[in-house]
Amino acid sequence: MITEQQESEIRNYLLSKKLPIDILIEVNDHFISQISDVQREENLSFEEAFEKTKLSWDKELKPYWRGNLNLEDISDFMVKTNTEIFRTNLFFALKYSTIPTLLIFFIALNFKAETFGYLTLSIIFGLTFYTLIKYFSNYQDFKLAKKYKKYVLTLHQHSVFIFLIIFSPLLNIYTRLIDNPEKYQKIITFQSDKPIFIEIVFIFMSIYLIIFGVFYSLSAQKNYLKQIEKVKPFLKYL
């Protein structure tokens, strides 16, 4: 049976590994379970079982420089976790950003230029403001990441604000669609008299990246809020 003092020792050890708190909680549960099993099966003391468990996790948790430009040491376990989180948010964004992008293309094919301009802006701004509203409606939860800035509460917190990066291209698109919606309607539908490949790519990518950034942030927000509920009971130990 693991005592409170021993649990504290395990927590402090894992905190020294600078794991995100949501990941630390999961690893902590594995440590406790593994230590208990080793004690029971091999008739070892807590200290002996703890050392044996630490050794079994050493390769996974040991940080080292992987040739990154930021010179940050990172463990294999964290690389794996980072990759999983990136893929989760990426696939969510790819999946859901396709729908409004196709809708904009449909509008460009079936509506007048002025209507196309206003409807496209409505979709883009609507999605962006929805992301902002969701953020501020859960502001107290998102604020925890700043309050406990010495720690990473969850890796999802790094992607919550990606939608802010899109404001520059958003204003660019706004100006272009207001000033000359007909030109960009023709570009999007490949009806321009002298289509310029670079311009076509720029317009498509600008619109798609704005929408993609919004859904990437929405995925990060959703996962952050899910993980922060697991983290809250642990905050008293920080």
Show where each model-derived region lies:
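Acidic-enriched, low-complexity/disordered segments with a strong bias for Aspartate over Glutamate
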Residues: D22, D29, D37, D58, ...
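Serine/threonine-rich low-complexity intrinsically disordered regions
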Residues: T3, S45, N70-L71, K112, ...
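Generic surface-pattern signal
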Residues: L15, L19, S36, R40, ...
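N-terminal, intrinsically disordered, low-complexity segments
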Residues: M1-Y64
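Hydrophobic alpha-helical bundles in membrane proteins
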Residues: I85-L238
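Exposed alpha-helical structural elements
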Residues: Q5, E9, E48-A49, D73, ...
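Cytosolic juxtamembrane regions of integral membrane proteins
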Residues: L44-I107
